[in-house]
Every structure is written in structure tokens, then in C-alpha cells.
């Protein structure tokens, strides 16, 4: 029963922190270490990937209108140009994360091995969240160019590191390039679909019989993810990301103190 609650708790943590700008990877790495989970490295990675797949479905549920508009637009003559531009923007925004994830897999794995590095990266996340509240553009997603989509994608690629928030970095980058707060959130959500789906599918085959409670984590991550998406949208629209920055700083200092990093 204790193991069940551990997996469920990790699912809730993943669902909330995947979208709240406080770094899901950092939280999962630190918390799993503190909980002393009896999982082999590959199995732990696979479980985390399964949680990413759960958050993919949460985003899909939350953005189904946008996703359906893009898909259906491909088959409607008067909407094809808009649909294909959206697809191109999302592809180029995803490309950097794919290159970094596949090209530096071993180095990234090492970053997940301890808790000091994620704690330090939480301070980086805090810095960008404080800056994000300073921007308030008026551009729409379709005003982006392939170049700006690629640049926003670079920020997403950096967030592969534990402790760097994907949602925080992508929302910051979108705001930096002039998107409105609402469209910054929308683009961040849509960008997460290929990344979370890819991470889940690639590692899903590694889930073993040693994780019998993985489904509880999956369900918890899905519902917590929906809550996290709703909360992020509200906080971004009201320009209140700074509160999450202070949270990241506090958590970072606590973890560094526990680990002896400071």
C-alpha cells in the first residue's frame, strides 16, 4: 500500500509541475531520491516517461479544440494555409528538443543522477520567471516566423535539463518574441504535445513488471495535469509568474541545504 501511495504521489507531482513553471523533472528527481524508491535507473526513467505520456493526454484534453482545428483545417481548402503554417511552426519549435534529447542522452542522464544540479537549475528557472512578467506582447501565434518558432524551441530544448521548467521557458520565450499572454500559453501547450508524446513512447517499452503501481501514477498525473494547465493559464494571463519564481528559489535553497550544496 505504501508503494501505491508513492507512485500516486509522484503522478500528482508530475501532473502539476509539468505545467506549473517549477520544473517537473527537477521535482521528480529530488523527490524520488528523498523517498528512496527501490527502482533501477532504467525502470525509474520508464516510469517518468509513462507520467509524461499521461500529461500528453492531459494537454490533448485541454487543447482538443486547437488540435482539431489544425487537423480538420488540413482538409478544408480555405483553412489549409493556416493549418499547415501551424504544423510547420510546431515542427520547428519541437526540432531543437529532439536534437538535444537524442544527441546528448548520456550527458542528460548524468544530470538526473543527483539532486544538487536540479536545485541549481531551479534558480535559473526562477530568473526567467521573474523576467517573464515584464513582457506583454500582442502578437498571435500565426504572426510567428519559422525562425522565431525555432528560437522558442531552443528554450524548450534547454528545459530537458532537470530543474529547468519547460512551461516556464517556453512561455518566457513566446512572450519575449512578442506573443500575447494568451497565445504564449496556447503555443506552450501545443509545443508540449510532440515532446511529451515522444518521451513517453520512446521509453514506454522499458516499463517492467517491477512497477505494478505505475497505472496509479498515470491516472494521478492525468488529472493533476489538467489542474496544472488551468492554473498556469490563469497565472500567466494575470502576470503572476513571479510567485512561482520565489517558490523555485525556496525549494532550491532547501534542497541545497539538505544535500550540503551550500
From Swiss-Prot:
Membrane topology of this protein: Multi-pass membrane protein
Phylogenetic lineage: Bacteria, Thermotogati, Thermotogota, Thermotogae, Kosmotogales
Gene Ontology MF term list: undecaprenyl-diphosphatase activity
UniProt KW Ribonucleoprotein keyword: no
UniProt subcellular location: Cell inner membrane
UniProt function note: Catalyzes the dephosphorylation of undecaprenyl diphosphate (UPP). Confers resistance to bacitracin.
Catalytically driven reaction(s): di-trans,octa-cis-undecaprenyl diphosphate + H2O = di-trans,octa-cis-undecaprenyl phosphate + phosphate + H(+)
Listed transmembrane segments: 44-64, 84-104, 111-131, 144-164, 187-207, 212-232, 242-262
Protein name as catalogued: Undecaprenyl-diphosphatase
A GO term from the CC aspect: plasma membrane
Entry keyword set: Antibiotic resistance, Cell inner membrane, Cell membrane, Cell shape, Cell wall biogenesis/degradation, Hydrolase, Membrane, Peptidoglycan synthesis, Transmembrane, Transmembrane helix
Gene behind this protein: uppP
Superkingdom per UniProt: Bacteria
Class in the EC hierarchy, top level: hydrolase
Family statement: Belongs to the UppP family.
Major localization listed first in the record, in broad terms: membrane
InterPro entries, A to Z: UppP
Biological processes per GO annotation: cell wall organization; peptidoglycan biosynthetic process; regulation of cell shape; response to antibiotic
Note in the entry: Bacitracin is thought to be involved in the inhibition of peptidoglycan synthesis by sequestering undecaprenyl diphosphate, thereby reducing the pool of lipid carrier available.
EC number of the protein: 3.6.1.27
Amino acid at each position: 500500500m505504501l508503494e501505491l501511495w508513492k507512485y500516486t504521489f509522484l503522478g500528482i507531482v508530475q501532473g502539476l509541475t509539468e505545467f506549473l513553471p517549477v520544473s517537473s523533472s527537477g521535482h521528480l528527481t529530488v523527490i524520488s531520491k528523498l523517498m528512496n524508491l527501490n527502482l533501477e535507473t532504467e525502470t525509474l526513467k520508464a516510469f517518468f516517461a509513462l507520467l509524461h505520456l499521461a500529461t500528453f493526454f492531459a494537454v490533448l484534453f485541454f487543447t482538443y479544440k486547437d488540435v482539431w482545428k489544425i487537423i480538420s483545417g488540413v482538409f478544408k481548402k480555405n483553412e489549409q494555409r493556416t493549418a499547415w503554417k501551424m504544423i510547420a511552426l510546431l515542427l520547428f519549435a519541437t526540432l531543437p528538443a529532439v536534437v538535444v534529447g537524442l544527441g546528448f542522452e548520456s550527458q542528460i542522464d548524468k544530470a538526473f543522477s543527483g539532486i544538487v544540479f536540479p536545485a541549481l537549475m531551479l534558480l535559473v528557472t526562477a530568473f526567467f520567471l521573474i523576467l517573464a512578467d515584464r513582457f506583454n506582447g500582442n502578437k498571435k501565434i500565426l504572426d510567428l516566423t519559422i525562425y522565431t518558432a525555432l528560437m522558442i524551441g531552443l528554450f524548450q530544448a534547454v528545459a530537458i535539463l532537470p530543474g529547468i521548467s519547460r512551461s516556464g521557458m517556453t512561455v518566457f520565450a513566446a512572450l519575449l518574441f512578442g506573443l500575447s499572454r494568451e497565445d504564449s500559453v496556447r503555443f506552450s501547450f501545443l509545443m508540449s504535445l510532440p515532446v511529451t508524446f515522444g518521451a513517453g513512447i520512446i521509453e514506454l517499452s522499458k516499463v517492467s513488471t517491477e512497477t505494478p503501481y505505475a497505472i496509479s501514477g498515470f491516472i494521478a498525473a492525468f488529472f493533476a495535469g489538467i489542474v496544472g494547465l488551468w492554473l498556469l493559464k490563469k497565472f500567466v494571463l494575470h502576470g503572476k509568474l513571479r510567485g512561482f519564481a520565489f517558490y523555485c528559489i525556496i525549494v532550491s535553497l532547501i534542497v541545497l541545504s539538505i544535500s550540503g550544496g551550500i
